[in-house]
């Protein structure tokens, strides 16, 4: 082809898909579509260094913003069991209505049922609020274990960026929780249980059961009907429970004595209301209050007209949102049907490909929804100045440092000796990592494993960037040491609680833990000394030091002729070994104090133990 034309090639392929394309055409197509076009290979390599501090800054900005967003989202999060089902009335109006109604029925004489009903409503509100606080506290402790972060200090507007996220967050949650629980309990329990059971049980149970049912039915029905009728239409539940409780309580309570009314009414009302409300729910339209446009799966299951032979499969598919989305995606994409069929027929061939490493499998199972990304993106945009200031105060990077590179020299790639000489000759003059790139080929500068193995690290000039790069390297070392200490103490605690590892565990780890990642943070000797000390960190450290001393003594004694310095070192090491062996007998809550006593003009060492302040 004299001149390559992609449009013409595409037209020909669409008209006749069986048309063969020449190798030259494919090569031209590849060069036109590939941003990294192929050039003629060169036999020379160039030495260069580059810095990508902008990328490092962006990573830390993203990290700072993500942590702030997670804490902000936790503050605004309300557990599912405390979310409002409906907010038609407030707690105050419900209580006023209840008191006025029962005052008229009891001729202004306070009834025990009035007090118990109010207490039941308040107790329900308190219980749900307490559950919400406990859930948030648990999640907050988990986040702070992984992210030592204070959104009040680092990004103040993290939860004041929107009108509803500002100071109204606390009051809104408090008012919502109160009004929500009030509405749920008041609408359901008051209208259904109070009026129904009050009128029904008083007329039915007569004077013997009046005092018993007044307190029992209110408490029992309040808690039972509250959980069952929470998702049920108020008017429907009221009329249904009214007719049901009249017949049920009348027949049951009439033949039941005062001592058994509590269990009887609780069981009858729970079973009766559960059956009735299940039928009501099946024929009632609901929406997810957190997403009004979406019908919850458990509601959708009840509204579906499913044949008996498909019921088990539909239940399994709609058991979780993930399963439902996966099945729906496969059904809507015909091109996946054959591939999914092949995958299910031969899962062993597909698993190593789709889940090639443990980290890949973990990430593929925890895919964040798109709305989370957009919420996070909005949070970054709305708090950008604060997040930049926080990032610059936490980390030494500045946002105005960009990508830069420098080329030092070009040598022939076949002369490996000359390449090595360049590295060592200029090691005191080059300020950054040195990479060798092949001329005529594109070189990816990302942090790939192959690239990291080719870098040589030299630092001398350019103090500003040098300090930043040194800080980056120091962060890596500190992070590794912190991680190592964390693993060491957790392993010690594990040994204290469950004992040493099983004999076959080391074989299992060497067989299955083969993917790249954090390895060998604790040596074999350290693990053995931890087991020898039964998880006692202090004794394990002494055992480590004893091993070091014994190894040093062994090396010195293996030499034939020791120098004076080596002899002094041998004597010193033996004394350190003896002292370490004595330290093994020191209790954990005490401190050993060496005292020297003059005994007939001869100094003798005595040991004194003093209580340690823990």
From Swiss-Prot:
Keyword Protease: no
UniProtKB keywords: Host cytoplasm, Late protein, Repeat
InterPro entries: SDr-like
GO cellular component annotations of the record: host cell cytoplasm
Task of the protein: Plays an essential role in the assembly of the icosahedral capsid of the virus. Allows the assembly of 3 molecules of hexon protein p72 and formation of a thermostable trimer.
UniProt induction comment: Expressed in the late phase of the viral replicative cycle.
The protein's name: Protein B602L
Region (28 X 4 AA tandem repeats of [CNS]-[AV]-[DNS]-[IT]): 161-284
Family: Belongs to the asfivirus B602L family.
Natural source organism: African swine fever virus (isolate Tick/Malawi/Lil 20-1/1983)
Start and stop residues of the Sequence repeats: 161-164, 165-168, 169-172, 173-176, 177-180, 181-184, 185-188, 189-192, 193-196, 197-200, 201-204, 205-208, 209-212, 213-216, 217-220, 221-224, 225-228, 229-232, 233-236, 237-240, 241-244, 245-248, 249-252, 253-256, 257-260, 261-264, 265-268, 269-272, 273-276, 277-280, 281-284
